[in-house]
Amino acid sequence: MNIQSILSDKIKQAMILAGADQSCDALIRQSGKPQFGDYQANGIMAAAKKLGLNPREFAQKVLDNLQLSDIAEKLEIAGPGFINIFLNPTWLTTEISAALSHKNLGIQATNKQTVVIDYSSPNVAKEMHVGHLRSTIIGDAVARTLEFLGHNVIRANHVGDWGTQFGMLIAYLEKMQNEHASEMELQDLEAFYREAKKHYDEDEVFAEKARNYVVKLQSGDEYCRTMWKRLVDITMQQNQHNYARLNVTLTEKDVMGESLYNPMLPSIVKDLKKQGLAVENDGALVVYLDEFKNKDGDPMGVIVQKKDGGFLYTTTDIAAAKYRYETLKANRALVFSDTRQSQHMQQAWLITRKAGYVPDSFSLEHKNFGMMLGKDGKPFKTRTGGTVKLADLLDEAIERATVLINEKNTNLSNDEKEAVIEAVGIGAVKYADLSKNRTTDYVFDWDNMLSFEGNTAPYMQYAYTRIRSIFNKTDINSTALLAAPLTIKDDKERTLAIKLLQFEEAVQTVGKEGTPHVLCAYLYELAGIFSSFYEHCPILNAEDESIKLSRLKLALLTEKTLKQGLTLLGIKTVEKM
């Protein structure tokens, strides 16, 4: 149940009845201060200006046409023409009870779409590093959220499984006569890659064989395809281990690597040339885009085929967009990659649209993100300046969480302690990233992310277990609790009830904008509001049984909302800490 959306629709209709045009926007916002209501309509003044009317007079006309008596107990015109909306406590109690009895906390699927989410996308024959973390966990949180909202989500792990380097790798695999390639650890494969590159650079006979294998691989040679498949399988098995540790929902079935689009590339380039979009320049095929200018102010050229006949990432991304619309029948395609890819993606998609491969109704969205930085403000590296392997980062998270939990609590069984350590350690790394606006860079700081204070995973996980402990102290029957009447009299009860009913607003924003930090901020605010409620409104020691049950209902919905919200983020909860 999205209060903001309901109010927006109703007030927009009243604005239209009062004379505004169909494109008007009520601009409903949550109010920052209780004296200004629970919500404000901020679009009255802009609409009044278009009509040449006094904003306060137009606001009164809107109120005269507004039917909100069931939702709002009071409406008032404030300042130059704002409308302050005070929600009706009776309506709040009805909606809270409905959310408690609904499997998705009152959130119902609307406008179901098929959405492709392209995320993670590591390279074959290389181990995942910290540079893959953001795409993997942000994309996964958005995928989980869109599924929760009722959409059909297709995960696309666009792995780098094609290119000239595979000739070199196949040649070296053959040279080593390694018949047990599928058993190789990826750490060995990293060294294997370096050795293959060294041979390629230093041994011309080897390099010639490697180049020959590239041609054979691209032409479908069975031997080369088998060797290539081994390299892909080794890599994906190791990546799957990282995904499991990160509690990420990607599976091997979600792999849609660059090689998937290879059969499409020649015909796409031929068609671009036929349409006059691609022209020859020094043997290469280039698309010139007026929408992008080079440093001389001329239309920027985007190469779609090199003069040696090879294709580029742009060509593959055009094919991917076409495939996702035509074959996967998607309504939206979201790509999670870093900001440095923004121009590349916009150019590929502009060519896709110019060629008529997808209609305007098909939404192509680059959900770009900033970099993970060290405390020195530079890209996050090892002490020696090397790339940090993702597995090593997760190992350190577990080590630090082990120290932290051992200091905090010795009243847990070994199994309980192990579960808490994993949830806190991995959760801390994920939440520290997800809680930041994805478009900005952020500083990776172990001390901050493992703190039990502030907007962190440990704080959120503890907030959840704290509420669980309330229910562990009572033997109340869940059926009886759901049937008990809910009353909202205290201001703290009211504030908590409203925040609980704003869950869908946060979730819908994540689904629309691809911004998990909005959900993190919501959950942090909810935990803080519950803490204040808990301090001021006795629950188990309430003055009478009816108030106790009513407050337990608010506590139960808070518990469910925190758990559901953290689940959407891919953060595990525990029953005891």
Curated annotation (Swiss-Prot):
PANTHER family documented for this protein: ARGININE--TRNA LIGASE, CYTOPLASMIC, ARGINYL-TRNA SYNTHETASE
The reaction(s) this protein catalyses: tRNA(Arg) + L-arginine + ATP = L-arginyl-tRNA(Arg) + AMP + diphosphate
Protein name: Arginine--tRNA ligase
GO CC annotation: cytoplasm
Keywords noted in UniProt: Aminoacyl-tRNA synthetase, ATP-binding, Cytoplasm, Ligase, Nucleotide-binding, Protein biosynthesis
PROSITE patterns according to UniProt: AA_TRNA_LIGASE_I
GO terms for biological process, alphabetical: arginyl-tRNA aminoacylation
Recorded superkingdom: Bacteria
Subcellular location(s) per record: Cytoplasm
Family membership noted in the UniProt record: Belongs to the class-I aminoacyl-tRNA synthetase family.
Molecular function GO labels: arginine-tRNA ligase activity; ATP binding
Gene name for this UniProt entry: argS
Provenance organism: Haemophilus influenzae (strain ATCC 51907 / DSM 11121 / KW20 / Rd)
Quaternary assembly: Monomer.
KW Signal (keyword) present: no
Assigned EC number: 6.1.1.19
Cited SMART domains: Arg_tRNA_synt_N, DALR_1
Motif range ('HIGH' region): 122-132
